[in-house]
Every structure is written in C-alpha cells, then in structure tokens.
UniProtKB/Swiss-Prot annotation:
Protein name: Enkurin
Pfam families membership: Enkurin (PF13864)
Gene Ontology CC: one annotated term: axonemal B tubule inner sheath
Residue window of motif SH3-binding: 83-89
Biased composition (Basic and acidic residues): 61-72
Region (Disordered): 48-92
Gene name tied to this protein: ENKUR
C-alpha cells in the first residue's frame, strides 16, 4: 500500500474477480544461433549412430563352398629385361690377358696399423664387482660443468629479466605517487569557506521559509511526510553550518 494513501478504504469491500496472471515469456537461449552454426559446421552429413542400414541378403545368394576363401591373383610369367651378370670367377681360373695387381695387401695393412693412431678406449666406470659398465661422461662423476668459462656467472637472460622487472616497478611507483599527489587533500581558503557558509545559510533560509508556509493542521499523510522532510533538511543544514563556523581550517579531497 502506498504510504501517501490511507490503508482503510470503502473500495476494499468490493469483491474483485480473480484473474489468472499472464505467463512469463518463453525462455530462448542467447547461444541458440551459435550452437546451430557449430552443428552445421562440424556435423558430418548423412552420418548415423551405429552400423549403417544395409540391404537384407537374399535367400537366393546362399553360402557356397570355398566362397569366403581369398583368391590369389593369376600367376604371371617372369620376363627379364636386363641380361644376367657374369658369374664370379673361380679360384682356379687365371685372369684374362695375364693382368695381375702388384699391390701387397698384407704389407699395406700392416703399415696402416703401425702408422695409425691408436683408438682411445671410451671412459667407463664399474659400479658392481660383477663388471657392470656405464658411461663415465654422462654419470655426473666427472667435473664437467664447473670447468666452463661461464660457470657461476648470472645468465644474460636473467639480467635482462631483472632489468625489466625493476623498470616495471619504477613505473608502477611513479604511477602510485602521481595518483596520491592528485588525490591529496586541499585546504579551503577563507574566501571559499565564507562563500560555502553563506550558501548554506541561504539554503537554510529558503527551507525555513517553506517550512513556515505549511498549514497549521497536519491532517494527512502527505503533509506529515512533507513536514518531516523539511525538518530533516533544516537539521542537516544546521549541522553543516555549525561545523564550518566551529573549524576555521578545513581540508577537502581533490577529485581532479
């Protein structure tokens, strides 16, 4: 019930016909068009769940003997396109035209072995008495990385990352200081304080004049509410005027 009207009324005794409230609008998802487009985009046309529908085999096509055995392709005759290579000569056969190599393979191999550099065995370590061998270089037992030139030096990418973090922190601090400077408290001058005080007093006089113009008899709810509203406004204005008259120095927040 609206507070501006009285709760008691003779019209309340009139019986009213009950009317069925209208149904709310049907819910329609906002993603309907998106889902429809996705289904048309990714769905395979004419695809079904499970095996496809096939024709029922006819009784005339009954199973015959050896019908499911795999049939081999017909054999083709092998045709040689290139002539055969000559066979390897026997040990008893002599070379054609008496051609022989004068190279002494035995002495050549012996000289290569004597003059060649001996292969160094791969360094290994044995961890058990049964002779289990493992690679020594990848085992971590050999001081490999501590002998590097850049061992113990901060990597370049970490230095670059630290500089970026430091620069970002400085920019953030400057941004915070700038916001604090903009939001600093501002002191009202004597002229501004006096202008605000006179404006409050003028507003109080206007509200008080309107309050004095009210009727003597307050016999309705709207009149009571109007009177209460004017009293609250006058009370707030009196409080603000008292604060400004009591304190000579006033600070306000700078909203710029």
């Amino acid at each position: 019930m609206d507070p501006t009207y009285s709760s008691e009324s003779i019209y309340n005794l009139i019986p009213s016909d009950w009317k069925e409230p209208p149904q709310p609008p049907r819910y329609i998802s906002i993603f309907k068009a998106t889902v429809k487009d996705d289904m048309q985009k990714f769905k395979t046309a004419m695809k079904t769940m499970g095996p496809a529908k096939l024709e029922v085999p006819s009784p005339k096509d009954f199973l015959k003997k050896h019908s499911k055995e795999k049939t081999l392709p017909p054999k083709k005759k092998f045709d040689r396109h290139e002539p055969k290579k000559p066979p390897v000569p026997l040990r008893t056969e002599h070379p054609v035209m008496g051609i022989q190599s004068e190279k002494n393979f035995i002495n050549t191999n012996a000289a290569n072995v004597i003059m060649g550099v001996a292969k160094k065995p791969k360094p290994v370590y044995v961890d058990k008495r049964t002779g289990d061998k493992h690679d020594l270089e990848t085992s971590g037992l050999v001081p490999k990385y501590i002998n590097k030139k850049d061992y113990g030096v901060t990597p370049e990418y970490i230095c670059k990352r630290n500089e970026e973090v430091k620069k970002a922190q400085e920019e953030y601090d400057n941004y915070i200081q700038e916001n604090l400077r903009k939001a600093a408290m501002k002191r009202l001058s004597d002229e501004e304080r006096e202008a605000v005080l006179q404006g409050l007093k003028k507003n109080w006089e206007e509200v008080h004049k309107e309050f004095q113009s009210l009727s003597v008899f307050i016999d309705s709810i709207p009149k009571k509410m109007r009177k209460q509203k004017l009293e609250e406004e006058m009370k707030q204005l009196e409080h603000d005027i008292a604060v400004l008259e009591k304190h000579k120095i006033i600070y306000i927040a700078n909203k710029k």
